[in-house]
Amino acid sequence: MTDKQETTQPAEKLQQPEKVAENVDPSLELNKTKVNFTPEKTDVNTYKFYPDDPESTLNRYRFAVKGASEYYDPCQESSKMSFKCLELNNYDRDLCHDYFDAYRECKKQWLKARREKREFWE
């Protein structure tokens, strides 16, 4: 044996750092019990089918400061939900159709906002 013996650390000391959400909007509600997609008004146009807010100030800022070749998705949480649905349902796309629709609606809202108010997104 050598003078320097390797010491192994107990498993308690080798804890992984907490996983930090990489791109989460602080206004995004992640607690499932507090999420309410039904509107307070009876107007159908106030329905929201996805958790993201693609027109938020934070999303505008992140889009403006990203590099020219970087991809930014303001509907990231909806995207994650659709992939999670696929994983849980053995990649059966028919069972996750609603999640795909929610992601699509979020992207439509974002693109429409960018077209209508270009000066806010540059």
From Swiss-Prot:
A motif (Cx9C motif 2) lies at residues 96-106. Its main location: mitochondrion. Residues 1-26 are annotated as: Disordered. Residues 72-114 form the CHCH domain. A motif (Cx9C motif 1) lies at residues 75-85. One of its GO terms (biological process) is mitochondrial respiratory chain complex assembly. InterPro entries: CHCH (IPR010625), COX23 (IPR051040), Cys_alpha_HP_mot_SF (IPR009069). The keyword Transit peptide applies. It is found in: Mitochondrion intermembrane space. GO terms for cellular component: mitochondrial intermembrane space. It comes from the Eukaryota. Disulfide bonds join 75-106, 85-96. Keywords: Disulfide bond, Mitochondrion, Transit peptide. Gene3D superfamilies: CytochromE C oxidase copper chaperone. Required for the assembly of cytochrome c oxidase. Belongs to the COX23 family. This is Cytochrome c oxidase-assembly factor COX23, mitochondrial. It comes from Kluyveromyces lactis (strain ATCC 8585 / CBS 2359 / DSM 70799 / NBRC 1267 / NRRL Y-1140 / WM37). The lineage of its organism: Eukaryota, Fungi, Dikarya, Ascomycota, Saccharomycotina. The gene is COX23.
